[in-house]
Amino acid sequence: EERSLNMQREYDVIVAGAGIVGAAIAYGLAGYDKRVLMLDGADTDYRAAKANFGLVWVHGKGYRYPEYHRLSAAAADAWPEFAAGLEAETGISLDYQTGAGLKFCLSDDELSARAKMLGAWEAETPELAPSVRILDRSELARRYPTMRLGPDVVGASLGEQDGQANPLRLLAALQAAFQRRGGMVRNGHPVTSIKP
């Protein structure tokens, strides 16, 4: 099998794994006119894209680590343009939605602690516009009248920068765009070791 990968072609970069992270790296490199080979295992292998919610999440990230907060905010700000470009390149909708990430609180103490933590979190990055609101139960019910709240929900924090994309569509779009850019994918070729 190793010989079959030598295919009379040399590669600038070989990416191990065609999941979301590997596909995103390979997609980006192929955009810089790099000759990229992406190796992957079987279709039945575990993929994070199959198990995650596709969150593009900012609120609360990087508490006590302001650089992580800044990076998360910048990434979320870049997502609409990234999603639109990838959709235009592939014709695959990512089902990207933004503007409402909720973290529910089940007691007054939890809601108060959440508000205090998020206030401190926003204070760590004064250059960033505030993007979080604390909603009590009645505000939640007014804002989301069709949402059925459990009896213990007293409120929530709302991240106005938060969103989500369909992770399976994102994976399909990244892999398709990578191949359109000239990248080569070899499925059924798991990387089991790397030798210098």
What do these predicted regions represent?
Residues 1-6:
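Short, Lys/Arg-enriched N-terminal segments with co-localized hydrophobic residues
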Residues 11-38:
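N-terminal Rossmann-like FAD-binding beta1-loop-alpha1 element of flavoenzymes
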Residues 31-51:
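Glycine-rich FAD pyrophosphate-binding loop
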Residues 40, 136, 187-189:
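Short loop/edge segments at beta-strand edges and connector loops
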Residues 42-44, 140, 174:
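Short beta-to-alpha linker loops that shape the active-site pocket of alpha/beta-hydrolase fold enzymes
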Residues 47-54, 145-149:
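Short, flexible, mixed-charge acidic loops at enzyme active sites
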Residues 54-143:
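Dinucleotide-binding Rossmann-like beta1-alpha1 core, especially the glycine-rich loop
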Residues 157-196:
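Helical element adjacent to the flavin cofactor pocket in flavoenzyme catalytic cores
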